[in-house]
Regions:
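C-terminal motif of bacterial Sec signal peptides marking the signal peptidase cleavage site
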Residues: 21-22
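Short acidic, glycine-rich surface-loop motifs adjacent to enzyme active sites
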Residues: 27-35, 134-142, 318-336
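N-terminal module-boundary/linker segments of secreted carbohydrate-active enzymes
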Residues: 27-71, 77
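Structural beta-sheet core signal
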Residues: 61-62, 168, 369
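Extracytoplasmic mature domains of secreted/periplasmic and thylakoid-lumen proteins
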Residues: 126-211, 221
């Protein structure tokens, strides 16, 4: 290409981008995203990529629970807009990873999956049914007869057996489906404590998930466990839910020498890391608070970023390590039809990934970022560039310029860019002050679209509109993205079955 043509392309894009970004921060990149030269620069970077075929000394799997591709896109725009940009051109840290692909998430018995079956696929290398934890597809859900003889060995168990250090970090209860699939085996994801076991299950010797974590006997044990769900580990006399009078936290401390237990953000920041080999942190009775609420209400719980940073500080004392990280409350916010909290959780998830990237040797650590399944949130409506992602749609006129007024649907009412195919937002998206995003409407009204004229779609408690009335919004069955960097990351490209991710991680670490 001639110099004059390059100058022409460059000048045209700078002029266009300057007009679009009139209300944004000044450009720091001489080749703005979307320009000819930016794409050419990207091509050169791709041509220069070298495949890393070294054995991984560390493996980190980041799982954004329910982090659909639409969630990633909306969070990217939201983060960019919070930074003063138009938003669409922004990149989350993991979107800069050199390799990416798509993961097919179905369970062996469901077109649209649940977290138990999908995480089992990533942790064991085999797909299974919905609702079961690291047992094979021959097991029957909630059947006590399936408690024994159907176990699938997990990557974490294999790593511990081969002398690796291991850690689990989550913003949900540590006994919830996704983290549980790393260490437990159960035909029922809801058997989190002995209280949840049926009489028949107890007779058959079925073990609750919390007790399986404490009794974990592979290698020298899991070094780092951080999350919520304290009630599953304590007897009723200690404000827990256990009916067998076991105090699992005390059992864990007695079992592991050089161990520390923490239950608040302050304690996590101040425990003696030099004298600690094993760390257990249970920061709430159930799930941790949403990140937005934690910050707004100054709650004494750690952020996901802080937990990941602490976990890596401990695990990197060892020659090789495996760390599993879940941002679990993205999923919960979507179930509640509350896009604001889903996006805030995703942004914190991205911050945790960025911090991990700063702490590790990226040439020796395989890092994989993905989701277990999708959700029904969509991005639609022809909004103009830079339109608030949580706001009502304002489109362009026939000349391509932004309109002064909001776009209206066929019923002459404004509509939001983000909406759900189903969920609690069907009858009245505006929170009435009596419902929190975790409290679903018990009986959504089957009524027509309500008036949106006085809605504030950017309010934290706003429930985006939903087409079909559900008490809780459902998962979706579309593929989710996989992002990877480090040793053997180039194997995670194209369209893959979800259980393939396990095989790449196992190969990368020679496990």
């Amino acid at each position: 290409m001639s110099v004059l043509k390059k100058i022409s392309h460059f000048s045209q894009w700078i002029l266009l981008y300057t007009l679009l970004a009139a209300c944004s921060d000044k450009l720091s990149n001489p080749y703005p995203p979307g320009s000819f030269d930016h794409a050419d620069q990207k091509l050169q970077a791709s041509l220069d990529k070298q495949e890393n075929t070294e054995t991984a000394e560390g493996i980190i799997l980041f799982v954004g629970d329910g982090m659909s591709i639409a969630t990633v896109t909306a969070s990217r725009i939201y983060a960019g807009q919070k930074a003063g940009q138009l938003g669409e051109e922004y990149q989350l840290s993991f979107e800069k990873f050199p390799y990416s692909g798509l993961s097919k998430t179905y369970n062996t018995n469901q077109q649209t999956p649940d977290s138990a079956g999908t995480m089992t696929a990533m942790m064991t290398g085999s797909k299974t049914k919905a609702g079961v934890i690291s047992v094979n597809t021959l097991a029957s859900r909630a059947d006590p007869e399936s408690c024994n003889g159907y176990h699938l060995k997990t990557l974490l168990e294999t790593a511990e057996d081969q002398g690796w250090a291991s850690g689990i970090v989550t913003t949900t209860s540590i006994t919830h489906a996704t983290p549980a699939a790393t260490y437990a085996h159960s035909p029922e994801r809801n058997w989190e404590s002995d209280k949840d076991l049926s009489t028949q299950a107890k007779k058959k010797g079925c073990r609750d998930i919390a007790s399986q974590l404490i009794e974990f006997d592979y290698g020298n044990g899991i070094e780092v466990i951080l999350g919520g769900g304290r009630k599953h580990f304590l007897p009723e006399s200690e404000k827990g839910e256990r009916q067998d009078d076991r105090h699992l936290i005390q059992e864990w401390l007695a079992k592991n020498k050089q161990s520390s237990y923490v239950s608040s953000a302050d304690e996590l920041l101040n425990f003696d890391i030099k004298k600690t080999k094993y760390l257990l942190g249970l920061f709430s009775k159930s799930h941790l608070n949403y990140e937005a609420d934690r910050v707004a209400n100054n709650i004494d719980e750690p952020s996901l970023t802080t937990m990941v940073e602490t976990a890596l500080q401990l695990l990197q004392k060892h020659k090789r390590f495996l760390l599993i990280v879940e941002s679990g409350r993205i999923d919960h916010a979507h179930h509640a039809g509350n896009a604001y909290r889903a996006l805030e959780e995703t942004i914190e998830f991205d911050k945790a990934i960025a911090r991990a990237n700063e702490l590790i040797d990226t040439n020796k650590t395989l890092m994989v970022v993905t989701a277990d399944h999708s959700h029904t949130m969509t991005i639609a409506g022809y909004p103009t560039r830079g339109n608030p992602i949580l706001g009502f749609v304002k489109g362009n006129d026939s000349t391509g310029k932004s309109k002064d007024n909001l776009s209206l649907a066929a019923d002459n009412q404004p509509y939001t860019t983000l909406s759900y195919a189903n969920g609690a937002g069907h009858d009245n998206p505006e929170d009435d002050g009596q419902h929190t995003p975790l409290s679903y409407r018990s009986s959504p009204q089957k009524v027509g679209r309500h008036s949106t004229a006085n809605d504030n779609p950017q309010a934290p408690n706003y429930r985006q509109e939903a087409n079909v009335p559900f008490q809780s919004e459902t998962h979706a069955g579309d593929d989710v993205a996989v992002y990877a960097q480090g040793p053997w990351a180039h194997l995670l490209t194209g369209v893959m079955e979800q259980n393939y991710i396990y095989h790449v991680m196992k190969h990368a670490g020679e496990l």
